[in-house]
C-alpha cells in the first residue's frame, strides 16, 4: 500500500456549455447572476444552522462552516493538533445570504487529530474534534481481476467499512481491453472500495469508469486510455465532433456573434474517462495516468469546445480529492477540459464543496485545464502544474465560495492554434452575490491573459508572480477585490522554471521540466537532441519507466527504464524521429519519469 512518507512529507500552509448548466439571468445593472430563487439557492448550498460548527477534513485540509444569525464582532476561528498550541485561521468570511461563516484550514498533517473552535473574546461559541484522512487503509478483501473474463460493464456494488476496505486490482503487466460500447467499470452505491493498479484500454462509451452514489471510493495508480466514441468533425456544425453519419445541424448566428443550433443530437460532448456523479462523497482519484482519449475537442476558433477529457465532476455531495495525477492530452486529441464541471452555474455544481485538487499535471486542453465552475464552496486548488491549454483554472460561475487557488504554476497557455485566454478565468458567466476567490502565490509564466476582475467576484490576490505581459485586467470593475504584494513584468527563463511542480511526494527532482522552440525545417529538427537529469532526494533507489502518450511517436527518451540510485543521478536524452515529423505545424508533447507507485515528474516539449 502506498505511503505518503516514503520519501517526502508534503505540507503547505465544457460539458460546460452543453449540459446541466445552471440558469443565469442578466440584471438591470448588466451583471450576470443566478436565476435561482433564494429558496432554491439555500437548498443547494445547504448552510448549517445557527450555532452549528461543521468540519469536513480531507488529507491535509478542512472545510469549516459555522452558522451565525449575524456578523460577530471579534470572532476568531482557531485550530490545533490535539493538545497543541492554538493557531488563528485566516480568510474566514461571513455570508449574509446563508448566515454563516465559511473558510478552509490549509496545510494540515495527514492522519492527525485536530481541535477546532469558534471564539469571541474569552468565550468559546462552538468546538469540534476531527481527524484528517490517512493514505493508509486497512484492506479486508482483495479481488484480483482476470482481464480475459470481465463482462462489461463490470458492476461493483460492494460495501466495505472504515476498518475493512475492499480492493480490486489485477496482475501486473496485464491490460483490461474494453472493445464494447459500455463503460469498463460502474461503481453503483459502492462504499469503502479501492480500484488500484488497473490498466484499462477502451472502450467506445463516453466513460471508462463511472461512480454513482458512492461513498469512500479511491481510484489509485491506474492508467486509463483509448476510451471515447467514434467521431467525425462537422465544420458546418461549429467544428465540433459528431457521431459518424449524424445529419449536420442547422446553425443560426446572430449579429452579436452568438448562435443557436438545431439538430445536434449526434454531437459528442462529455467523453470523460472518470465520471463522479451527483450524490458521491469522499472520492479520491490519485496517482493515475489518463491519456489518449479517442475524441479530439475542437478549438474556440470554431465554437465552444466539445469532446472529451479526463475527469468529470457532476455535483458530488462533498469531499472529493484529486491529487498527484497526470492528465495528458495532445494536439491530435486535445481535451475539452482536463477536469470539467457539471452544473457550471449551479450552487452545487462542479466539485461542489469541501474538495482538494493538488499536485496534478494537466496539459493540452482546448478550453480549461480545470474547470472549478459551480459551488466552489471551500474548494481548494494548489500545487498543480497547468500547461499548454487555452485556460489554466476556471473559477467563473463561483456561486457559493470561498475558492482557493494558490501555489500553482501556469506555463505557456495556448490552444492547438497557439491562442491563449485568461490564465485564471473569471469572466464570461455569473457569480454568487458574495463570492470570494483567494488567489495567492501562483506563477503566471509565458503566454496568457492573466486574470480579469469581475463585479460580483471578490478576488483577493496576494504574492502572485506575473511574467511577461500577464496582468490583472479591469481592476476598476471590482472595487471589493484587492491585489497585495503581486509582482508584474517579471522575467524568468524557461530553464529557471521549477522542476518540483507539481508538488508531489516523489523522491527525485528534474534539472529541467520544459523545453520549447523545437522546429522542423527541411527534414531537420532543431535542436537535434535534448538532455536533462533526475537527481535523487531520498535514501532509497527508485525504479522508473518513461511513460508517454501514443500520440507522441515522434520523440524517444533514453533510457526508457532504469533506477535512480539513492543520492545519485541519471541523465536522460530526448531524440527526435524526423520521419514522423512531417504532418503538422506544431510539435508539442510531454512525457513522465514515472515510478511503480504511480508518482512522476513531467517534462513538456
Model region roles, listed by residue range:
Residues 76-111:
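Recognizes extended acidic, P/S/T-rich segments that occur
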Residues 107, 148-167, 176-218, 230, ...:
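Extracellular beta-strand-rich solenoid/capping regions of secreted or surface-exposed proteins
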Residues 180-185, 204-210, 233-277, 298-317, ...:
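Extracellular beta-strand/beta-solenoid scaffold signature
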Residues 404-502:
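Predominantly extracellular beta-rich ligand-binding scaffolds that present long acidic/polar faces
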Residues 503-543, 596-605:
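Long, low-complexity ectodomains and other extracytoplasmic segments of secretory-pathway proteins
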Residues 506-519, 537-575:
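Surface-exposed binding patches on compact interaction domains or structured appendages
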Residues 584-597:
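A short beta-strand micro-motif common to beta-rich folds, especially ectodomain repeats
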